[in-house]
Amino acid sequence: MSQGWRGGSGGWRGGGGGNPYAGAWRGRPWRGRGQGGTWSRNNGRDPVCFAPPKPQLTQTTLDKYIPYKGWKLYFSEAYSDNSPFLEKVRAFEKFFKKQIELYDKDEIERKGSILVDYKELLQDEDLSAAIPLSSELKDMPEKVLECMGLAIHQVLTKDLETHAADLQQQEGLRTEEAPIVNVPFIHARVFNYDTLTSLKNLRASLYGKYVALRGTVVRVGNIKPLCTKMAFSCNMCGDIQCFPLPDGKYTVPTKCPVPECRGRSFTANRSSPLTVTVDWQTIKVQELMSDDQREAGRIPRTVECELIQDLVDSCVPGDMITVTGIVKVSNTRDGGFKNKNNKCMFLLYIEANSVSNSKGQKGKSTEDSGNHGASMDFSLKDLYAIQEIQSQENLFQLIVNSLCPTIYGHELVKAGLSLALFGGCQKYADDKNRIPIRGDPHILVVGDPGLGKSQMLQAVCNVAPRGVYVCGNTTTTSGLTVTLSRDTTTGDFGLEAGALVLGDQGICGIDEFDKMGNQHQALLEAMEQQSISLAKAGIVCSLPARTSIIAAANPVGGHYNKGKTVSENLKMGSALLSRFDLVFILVDTPNEDHDHLLSEHVMAMRSGAKEIQSVDITRINTQNSNTSILEVPSERPLGERLKRTGEHFDALPHQLLRKFVGYARQYVHPSLSPDAAQILQDFYLELRKQNQGIDSTPITTRQLESLIRLTEARARLELREKATKEDAEEVVQIMKYSLLGTFSDEFGKLDFQRSQHGSGMSNRSKAKKFVSALNRVAEQTYNNLFEFQQLRQIARELQIQVIDFEAFIGSLNDQGYLLKKGPRVFQLQTM
């Protein structure tokens, strides 16, 4: 038996390989066993739905002429000139005849389906006059889609017959030698369906209706074969019949089609060529919450969707998709044995007709940053508003002050968060010969409690076109990355996306970053490689997590101690800290003028009065003798230029700002100009020159890449394709402000021999002296295990004076010099 649409050689051909006119979709008709076949195991339906006729039976229905060769493929009813579907088929046929030259026939042959734009159907005047398409497609989707499929089937059949006749005429063949065209079943997949249905409106009243919904894929099942037609052989006479299985529900024939036979028992013949199986997959889609749909205290709704044939593998967890399909019901799976009355309980699901993956579509190499805003639709009103915003004189100041207007001051911190919103451009995303370089900056805000870190974080996640906000103390590792769950019905393992995967091509805000415990290791790969690898239960895979991580943390002890480094204040590893492009340190310094203005601002916000004129709140640095590149004064600092001017400030609403950010991320892909590159290179080389000490902070190419990313984001903020010299200078000022917090000690002095990751300035020499003494003792005693009392004795002998000896040992433990092996027992790691 020939497989697929082939009965000889080539696509959709039959009748032997020696046919000189063999072409696509041509072949001999089905003549029984052993002849060129026209059914398919992998296609939706087959042209013959009964067993080969026996000689003693008369098939009178085949003698009637049917103008539509594929009628039996689409309709179970016999053809009639009075059929109510004929008018619809003719209207669709007229529409497809106009479009036939636009369709790729090879693509239709490969997929077995054709994509039809719903808006083009509505714009066709002849079709609109013949069929009330919008109401009929919604209320009778199966019949309308079958009419559409039969129409394209007929148009393609006639087109190929015309093509075959032309070839026959050129070669001078006789009419009886011409091959017969057989086109298989073709699915009509309607996309761009304009009326989106929210998941909360997906109720029993929509059963059998055609709907479109948009959401995020949170779970993808395995691909399985689904039997749509099964061949059954009669146990009494041996006759074979093909029995349809609607919706994949197994049913057995009730009687034999042979009139003389009264058999009632049948055997399924799974290996028969009449048995048709298709690829089948289930996905779980979670709703997207817009501003007017946010409901406090409710978990996001989900719905199951079934994909068949060419729709399988069209999405992965984390993708944002639009599914159009028919609402159907299935029996409830859980609790079926506990309660007999559960037979009346059903679950709604979507039988997908088309899937539009708005995130999985990759652009050209110049758009390697991905379609960050691809899921956003822009109306003409939106585009005019974006044009109006872009024409503002001081756009950077407008966006920075619109980000979180309730928080007073901190303009440079808001500037860094604004740049993270827009992001840089990812390089080599589609080049399989090179490793991609991330374009999303990561930002950490550390500071005393009560300075508005969490509010700024929530504002960023709210403005982002795709933002996920999580709290560190209630987050697990699998909740951040990927959860491996078992399906209750099939027992198969499936992937459920966590916060980082759901925030792909967006923002992931993590509050209480210092209270995450052991979950920090889960972020290392996601922050640099921008993917999450999983190896569990025999499943090895990698999921994309191209997200900017914005984190807020409180220092240990409740107050930031400038005598310690960032690593010591947060008790966090250097591997994680080095991945942040900007680290902002907010210190609550008492100051009479600032406190007075801040209190006035809070009272004005609470009372609804006109906002006071803001002044820039900057860190008060004492005079110091160190001269460095971080302290070179500019004509007018960026912080001064970003502060609000005038008595009244009109901030952009978040909904409009979200549209602007989405437009910039989708359509603007800037590159560095030579002047900007020179400024960044000079600043980087100066930093390297000032950090040549043995114990100095490692200024690596990560800092240079951070500068490039932020400069691209600065140009993207103003919708420019080139980053200018001024962009680079402003980014350098933001980077200086960030580095000031890292390098300044408890006296306000700049000390370039301290880093984010090492010890505090006062403890460094003591730590080196103490560790070298431990090395000597361990070499003499051949034992690298020390009890706490022994460590205290060694420190006393060396006359090392520290305020808190336990904190001193804890610092050595954090830096990897000592490893805690048990209660008050430490192992030396440097020998």
Swiss-Prot record:
Q: What EC class is this?
A: hydrolase
**Bias-annotated ranges (Gly residues):** 1-20
Q: Which UniProt keywords apply?
A: ATP-binding, Cell cycle, DNA damage, DNA repair, DNA replication, DNA-binding, Helicase, Hydrolase, Nucleotide-binding, Nucleus
Question: Quick one: where's region Disordered?
Answer: 1-53
The EC number(s) attached to this protein equal: 3.6.4.12
Binding-site residues for ATP, renumbered to this chain: 447-454
Where do the MCM domain residues begin and end? 395-602
Q: Does the keyword DNA-binding apply?
A: yes
Q: Which PANTHER family match?
A: DNA HELICASE MCM8 (PTHR11630:SF47), DNA REPLICATION LICENSING FACTOR MCM FAMILY MEMBER (PTHR11630)
Subunit composition and interactions: Component of the MCM8-MCM9 complex, which forms a hexamer composed of mcm8 and mcm9.
What this protein is called in its record is: DNA helicase MCM8
The gene name reads mcm8
